[in-house]
Amino acid sequence: MLLQIYHTNDIHADFPFLSRVHGYLREHRDAQDFYFDSGDFTDLKSVLVQADRGKGALELMKLCRPDAMALGNNEIDLGSEDLEKLTAFPFLCANAVHNDGTAIPGLKSHVILERFGKRFLVIGLAPYYSAQMIPNKYNLFFEMGNIHTTDPIPAVERILEENRGSFDFSILLSHSGHLVDRELEKRLPPVDLWLEGHSHAFVTEKRYSQSGKGERLGRITLELDEQGVRIADSVQLELPKQGSPAFDARLEMAQAAAEEILSQ
């Protein structure tokens, strides 16, 4: 049996691109297929994001029915107060807390999703290390919004250990960058699939996928049988230029609402 995982990263409020994703998924995604995003979907350069601090933008993302989304630095830039209002969306982050170390209400570290009797452990990570593996690199800025990221290594180790025997396949939605992910892999127990973001790279390997800066749609094909779950294929899809009329209609309404808010 085949199961598809669709994946985006670093869309940075490029809603015309998301319209193309929406159109493609509506046509090709089966009911059981996954869609994940690895962070930086929002961006405060966007009028739509500025107007209501990300709520309208994420309502548009909901049209694509994501199963889980990583917390990127652009989501963290919204600050704790606004981020807490968005936790109805399927954000995951195992290494972000308030400055005082308390949990961010509603923000989950991981989920276990089931498809065809197989259990998929999905973990989200926000940036902590620089590309040169300098720790604590982002917190000077993050802490201005009362969010602090922590070392992802013990966080992932803990989740893998606590869920030992409760999953068949592990997926990391990592907004850490490809070079950091390669270093993390050396220091972590095995993770089956890394869906990456942050470094805006194109990565197409069986266990790694990253789709530039909101430029392509990753598609990973899994084979499921009584022996387990295996990665069969990984590609980056160049989407048709034509977007989704249904999405575009909602986008037009959202943009009008944003302009009205900002004009007040």
List PLM regions with ranges:
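Acidic, metal/ion-coordinating pockets
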Residues: 1-263
